[in-house]
Regions:
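Conserved NTP/Mg2+-binding pocket subregion across the NTase superfamily
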Residues: 3, 48-131, 219-220
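Short aromatic-enriched loop/helix-cap "lid" or pocket-rim segments at secondary-structure transitions
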Residues: 33-35, 71, 159-161
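Catalytic metal-binding acidic patch
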Residues: 23-65
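Helical scaffold of the NTase/Pol beta-like nucleotidyltransferase catalytic core
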Residues: 1-21
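Conserved nucleotidyltransferase catalytic core and NTase-mimicking acidic/glycine-rich helix/loop elements
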Residues: 99-220
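A generic short-segment signal for beta-strand/edge and adjacent turn/coil regions
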Residues: 6-13, 28-34, 108
């Protein structure tokens, strides 16, 4: 353990009200740089949440009940946390559960991606560049969550996506840079194959030919 974190874990080991300790953020994911802090979460059996900074350590105190019922926007952080201490075994269970997506969640991500792809291409066709670019960018948010979810894990926050998007990553980066509708069509065709292979053809078919139609659009 880092010298900044070790004393926190050692103190937690001897505190009967502490269920465990988590490390969150870039330090837990091997993505730290010289500006990265140490985000340490001390999980209590009982008590009030708190947060304080001590140099490069952000010390967060929460309860086991709150970890079990974490809000949806915090799930990526919990899913990619590192368990430093787990007296009851419940933290490991919570981290694992946070990383799982249901079929319903994955289907919704795919549908959201298709929706923004469809609307972006229609906007390009009508000469509405700003809307087309914004929709293209948002489509990639859904897509990243989908691709990592199909591989069995909840996506981390977007700043940690590099190197996690598989063979499609170069094309995704190109679409992120340009919002080029032709590149969007190329990407969607590849995504369609992946999603179909994972059993989500029903989502595509639910568009009743609308995606097929915008795939025939030609852009100069």
């Amino acid at each position: 353990l880092n010298d900044l974190v070790r004393p926190i874990v050692e103190a937690a080991e001897h505190d009967p009200n502490v269920a465990g300790v988590l490390l969150k953020g870039s330090q837990s994911m091997g993505a730290a740089d010289e500006e990265s802090d140490w985000d340490v979460v001390v999980v209590l059996l009982e008590g009030e949440p708190s947060q304080k900074r001590d140099g490069r350590v952000e010390l967060i105190t929460t309860t086991l009940e709150r970890v079990r019922g974490v809000s949806s926007w915090e799930l990526p952080a919990l899913a990619h946390s590192r368990v430093l201490l787990d007296k009851t075994g419940e933290l490991a269970v919570a981290v694992e559960a946070a990383g799982r997506l249901t079929r319903e969640e994955l289907a919704e991500l795919y549908d959201n991606y298709l929706n923004d792809f469809y609307r972006s291409l229609k906007a390009w066709r009508r000469g509405r560049e700003l809307g087309a670019r914004i929709l293209s960018g948002r489509s990639l948010w859904w897509l990243g969550d989908l691709l990592m979810g199909l591989e069995g894990t909840r996506a981390p926050y977007t700043e940690y996506w590099a190197g996690r998007l598989g063979d499609l990553e170069p094309l995704i980066v190109e679409v992120a840079r340009t919002a080029d509708p032709r590149k969007q069509q190329e990407l969607q065709a590849a995504v369609e194959q992946i999603a179909t292979a994972h059993g989500f053809r029903d989502v595509y078919d639910g568009w009743n030919g609308d995606i097929d139609r915008v795939m025939t659009f030609r852009f100069e």
